[in-house]
């Protein structure tokens, strides 16, 4: 069962760019296209919350930036919006197109959005910007393509996410094998140039065993590491060692996601 705690944060600049292999990330998510929806419990929960933050906005054109399989593209469309689905992973975008979830489909990078200035009313990006090399560049692009009076909605992961898994791997072989996520303060810094509001929440599902935990990551394509190594399912002996090293809580194996929800107002 997931437990959630939350509180509001407001932005307080240059952020260090991450070393991100975009082609490898796109390939990892393309491979996960068929399994993604059945495994994406966290993405569904965060996405629905993000939609609630902006669904009263009267704007008509929505950009779903990092659309994945298009689950939320379809959700916005059912709310009467015209939806542009954008993703870096060709496999994900092809799957979304097959499901006919949007009005237009764009293969592209959030940090270099292939749209003219001021072309959408709502820019929606659920759990995608943590894969960017430069959060500031992504937010700048969101702001550029959004019309004045529009709204930008994004969610991302902050430092501390997947920490239990990283600590367990450290016990096994001295390496964490999980991605590093930006500290909350760095996310606040990236938002400081805009009128905005940030909210944080802790999402902490528990799993019956380490294999189920690792499969939850593999099913959504999230086993790719920023610096290039894969952290997918391992051999039996390594998984057994990982399970021994993993600290149980309340009869399960927890995995923390430190969520950040952002709303930026396009002035």
Curated annotation (Swiss-Prot):
Q: What is its EC number?
A: 2.1.1.197
Taking the record's annotation, the residue ranges forming a coiled coil are none
Q: What class of enzyme is it?
A: transferase
Any Pfam family matching the protein:
Methyltransf_11
Q: In which pathway does it act?
A: Cofactor biosynthesis; biotin biosynthesis
Which keywords annotate this record?
Answer: Biotin biosynthesis, Methyltransferase, S-adenosyl-L-methionine, Transferase
Please give the Gene3D superfamilies that the UniProt record associates with this protein.
Vaccinia Virus protein VP39 (3.40.50.150)
Q: Which InterPro entries match?
A: BioC, Methyltransf_11, SAM-dependent_MTases_sf
Query: Which molecular-function annotations from GO does this UniProt entry contain?
Result: carboxyl-O-methyltransferase activity; malonyl-CoA methyltransferase activity; methyltransferase activity; S-adenosylmethionine-dependent methyltransferase activity
Q: Which reaction does it catalyse?
A: malonyl-[ACP] + S-adenosyl-L-methionine = malonyl-[ACP] methyl ester + S-adenosyl-L-homocysteine
- Keyword Amino-acid biosynthesis assigned: no
Q: Name one GO biological process term.
A: methylation
Entry's family note = Belongs to the methyltransferase superfamily.
The family database entries (HAMAP family) matched by this protein are listed as:
BioC
Outline what the protein does.
Converts the free carboxyl group of a malonyl-thioester to its methyl ester by transfer of a methyl group from S-adenosyl-L-methionine (SAM). It allows to synthesize pimeloyl-ACP via the fatty acid synthetic pathway.
PANTHER family documented for this protein: MALONYL-[ACYL-CARRIER PROTEIN] O-METHYLTRANSFERASE, METHYLTRANSFERASE
What is the name attached to this protein's record?
Malonyl-[acyl-carrier protein] O-methyltransferase
Record the organism: Yersinia pestis
Source lineage = Bacteria, Pseudomonadati, Pseudomonadota, Gammaproteobacteria, Enterobacterales
Q: Which gene encodes it?
A: bioC
């Amino acid at each position: 069962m997931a437990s959630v705690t939350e509180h509001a944060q407001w932005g307080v600049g240059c952020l260090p760019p991450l070393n991100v292999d975009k082609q490898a990330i796109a390939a990892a998510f393309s491979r996960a296209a068929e399994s993604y929806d059945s495994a994406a419990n966290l993405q569904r929960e965060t996405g629905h919350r993000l939609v609630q933050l902006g669904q009263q906005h009267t704007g008509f054109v929505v950009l779903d930036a990092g659309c994945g399989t298009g689950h939320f593209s379809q959700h916005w469309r059912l709310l009467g919006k015209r939806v542009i689905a954008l993703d870096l992973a060709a496999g994900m975008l092809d799957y979304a197109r097959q499901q006919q979830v949007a009005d237009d489909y764009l293969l592209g990078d959030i940090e270099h959005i292939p749209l003219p200035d001021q072309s959408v009313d709502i820019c929606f990006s659920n759990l995608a910007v943590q894969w960017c090399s430069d959060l500031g560049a992504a937010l700048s692009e969101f702001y550029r393509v959004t019309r004045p009076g529009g709204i930008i909605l994004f969610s991302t992961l902050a430092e501390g996410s997947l920490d239990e898994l990283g600590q367990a791997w450290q016990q096994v072989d001295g390496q964490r094998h999980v991605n590093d996520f930006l500290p909350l303060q760095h996310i606040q810094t990236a938002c400081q140039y805009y009128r905005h509001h940030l909210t944080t929440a802790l999402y902490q599902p528990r799993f019956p065993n380490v294999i189920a935990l690792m499969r939850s990551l593999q099913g959504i394509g999230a086993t790719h590491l920023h610096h290039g190594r894969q952290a997918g399912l391992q051999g039996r002996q390594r998984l057994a060692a990982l399970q021994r090293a993993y600290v149980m809580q309340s009869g399960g194996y927890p995995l923390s996601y430190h969520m950040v929800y952002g709303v930026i107002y396009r002035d």
